[in-house]
Structures are given as structure tokens and as C-alpha cells.
Amino acid sequence: MSEELTLQLIDLHAGGDVSRIVTGGIDPLPGNTVREKMEYLREDADGLRQLLLSEPYGIPEMSVDLLVPASDPEAEVGYIIMEVMGYPIYSGSNTICTATAVLESGLVPKREGHQRFILESAAGLVHIEARVENGVVEAITCEGLPSYIDTYRASIHVPSVGDVTYSVAYSGGFYAMVDAAELGFSLNRDEEARLAECAHAIVEAIQAERGFSHYTLGDVGPLPFLHFMGPVEQVADGFFRSRSTTYVHPGVICRSTTGTGTSARLALMHHEGTLQPGDKLETVSLRGTGFIGEFTGSRQEGDHRVAENTITGKAHMLARSDIVINCNDPLVECGSLHHILTSGHRRTEALPVEEEVSLSD
């Protein structure tokens, strides 16, 4: 009888984007930091990402977050983000889902009211504030990465689209920021397929023309994201709202507006001088879901004025499950995965033994 290989998952969604939190079934990864463990997965064990984001186990529109031990003693746990485009060092929606999962699993004890704790992403420490009411995690507020404008109102000719004006923001990944109305979109759900086609063409054109380098991280690869911006409506003093849509290359229109997309929009509004510290922006997706970003201040980093911000959203629990991996299945590719799998339901070292029962219930 062949050995049974399994992964333990908690599935949640934030704004419609599903995050699959891997809580067990993976051996300890090489690397002294979360960033080094992420790089090991990317270079030597990309099969985990491919497995859970491909049929028959998943689809590219999902994300995966692997819990790993934190390297910083301030953090409760580390997490590695995986998406269709690869390994972003940060994501707001994935952070909201991961923070909710560690509370719902008991890894971080849940308390009524407001509580704070720290997670460790590949980008560094992330401060979390959770709001718990009647035992339910009603909201997670997490730090957005310091965000800035790399390019403001450049122009490019895109075959099948025409001349496109775009800005580029960094908020955990580089985003092309485009005005939806200028491209003929109202940001309604029935436009989803055309939005994906348009974004694909624009991103391909920008990637072919130029690359982008972060002021401390250096080359972080080709531009992976595009954010369609609707008009901004002021709904109260210091509170704004805008329909928005985020595209992830290749081919994915996000269900939510995304946390990093919201941070990128805050950076652009700050660059244009329309925000004051404490101002908030609610981005609203094609499905009517939203995140609230708050501009908390700015500082100079080299040649860039970075916008500090927080993102608030709610994650909804979907499932706790054991995924059975059969490497004899012709639809399952285990070549870049088998060497990190643990047999027999053993938890990853990120999770204490005493939490095993509550996580597998």
C-alpha cells in the first residue's frame, strides 16, 4: 500500500479572493528567514504553488499561504504567499486571511474586542489589529507596505488598445495604474472578460518596453499587476470611495480590489496631493466587496516619498480540510513537491503540538 501524503488547509476569502492557508503536511524548509524559505520554494519546490492553484485541486484565481516558523521573536508565525504570478513578498488580502486563520485555529488565542499581534512575511514584520465580536473575527487591519510612485503619467502604445496613459506604483509589487474610463470601462461585472484582455495587452506591452527596480530590493522581476481606477467620490470628510479592479498577470481579474492595489491607489492620491494623514479610501470591486485603506503619513526614502498606510478588511471562513495527494494520479505533478511533503498528518513546525486537535476538527 502506498504512503498517504496529505496537506492540511484552512480556506478563507477576503472580498471574494480565496486564500488557502497551509497549516500542515510540509517538512521544515531550508532558510533562516521567511524570505529565505520563500526563495527556496520558488527555486526548488514550486510544486506546492502549482498543485494548489491548478486543477484538480484549485484554480489560478486562488492564492496559497504557507505557515512557517517566524525568524523574528516578535512574530507569532511566518507566512509565505503564493499566487499565479509567483511569490509576492506581501499581499493585503492574503495577510487578512492568514491573520484570521491563525486566530480561528487557536494558534493565536482569540480575545473579545481589539487585539494586536505580529506576523512575519517575506517583506518583514506585519503588525495586525483584529476586532473580535461575539467570538467572530469581524475585521483585520494590517500594515500596508510603504508605497510610492515610480512613474507618473507615462504613455505607451498598446496593440489592440491604442495609446495608454499609465502610472506605476510600488506597494508590495509594481502596479500599472490606469484610468478605467479612459479605456472605456465603467467597472461593472459584465466587463470582466474584456478587462482581463485589456490588462493583459497593457502589461505585456509595458513588460516588453521596460523593467522596474525597487530602491532597496533591486530587480523584483517583470511588472505583474495592473489596477483599473474608477472615479473618486468623497462620501464624508476625509473618506473617499472608488470602484477599482486589480489584474494579476497572466489572466486573472481579482475578486477583491486587493490590499496592495488599495495601497497603490493611496500612494497615487498622495502623490497628486489629494490626501491628508488620517484620510481613508474604500475601494469597491466588481462584486461590490471592498477594503478600506487609510493614509497614515509619509516619509522620504532616498529619491521617493513613500506613503504609509493600513488596510482593513474581513475574511470569511470556508473550510478546514485534509488534501490527499496521490503522486500516481496522471493529473498531479509531484516532481517539485514530493521532497517537501510530510506523511502521516504531521503538522509543520510552525504549529505547536497542542493545537493539532483544534486544527484538524
UniProtKB/Swiss-Prot annotation:
Source organism per UniProt: Chromohalobacter salexigens (strain ATCC BAA-138 / DSM 3043 / CIP 106854 / NCIMB 13768 / 1H11)
Pfam families named in the record: Pro_racemase
Protein name: Protein Csal_2339
InterPro entries membership: Pro_racemase_fam
Isomerase recorded as keyword: yes
Catalytic activity field: trans-4-hydroxy-L-proline = cis-4-hydroxy-D-proline
Reported function: In vitro, catalyzes the epimerization of trans-4-hydroxy-L-proline (t4LHyp) to cis-4-hydroxy-D-proline (c4DHyp), albeit with very low efficiency. The physiological substrate may be different. Displays neither proline racemase activity nor t3LHyp dehydratase activity.
SUPFAM superfamilies: Diaminopimelate epimerase-like
Keyword Isomerase: yes
Active site: S91
Taxonomy of the source species: Bacteria, Pseudomonadati, Pseudomonadota, Gammaproteobacteria, Oceanospirillales
Keywords of the record: Isomerase
List of residues binding substrate: G92, S93, G259, T260
Residue pairs linked by disulfide bridges in the UniProt entry: none
Family listed: Belongs to the proline racemase family.
Signal peptide bounds: none
Enzyme Commission no: 5.1.1.8
